[in-house]
């Protein structure tokens, strides 16, 4: 039994779904890129020069996408909600955009969104909303532009979406070349064959994932989504994805409560969680132990050291948060296996 890690792709199971991801997003009329990074860099072109306010907890690829702008960070509460007092203290006429992030399926509270809307009217900045973690909870809240990396949710060799009421420059997008992501797709197929015992190719697919991720990190060009990845958006049932994730999350949350642990974020029952994030006493040691049992937990996010004094929570997250997998690949038996393993090492958890 295995949990976490890269998604696998079973070609025999592919079929177009009525409630597909493509259909779910269709009312937003998104532009589909090869990655969320490309979508974000395309969005950054439309922002006026000035200061961008970013939340302190953020992937370094977001920081890189805004490298042509002056960056400041605003703080978050321990439950990853916007610290509005801190954000408001950093607003002035030089701020061209506020980057709004929702975390792990939780959506920022309505009161915070209303404060941000009022501040936007006062100062005239744009809101760039990152819906990567929240897209299946709500497609959009108040963003002028919304950016989403879809490959975090299901087997997709590459794919990011850009949408929102301020989206323009569709002509420039249409001129971008299409990405060819056959190698990453091959890695996903190989993982499927390895997991079902058909082919002993563990080292090969891990190497493919590592090399394609390195290539994405180094990529500077912008691309449209590949034809194959666009097709895959029609093969994933968005409703079924959300139902399974909610079920797995609730089961794991209840089991963790018996150990005295609880999720970092307040995720509503009707929201769709990405992972179940928890504070742990010895994250690295626990993560290593879980790997011995073929449970692979992502790190959100390794700390990049940028403006470290302004980002105390980001440093703590990088050292002490563990993201537990609860995605649609797994059933009750998988979640119980995860919980039993956590119980074995609860001394590292609490």
Segments from the language model and where they lie:
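PLP-dependent aminotransferase-like
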Residues: 13-24, 29-30, 38-122, 134
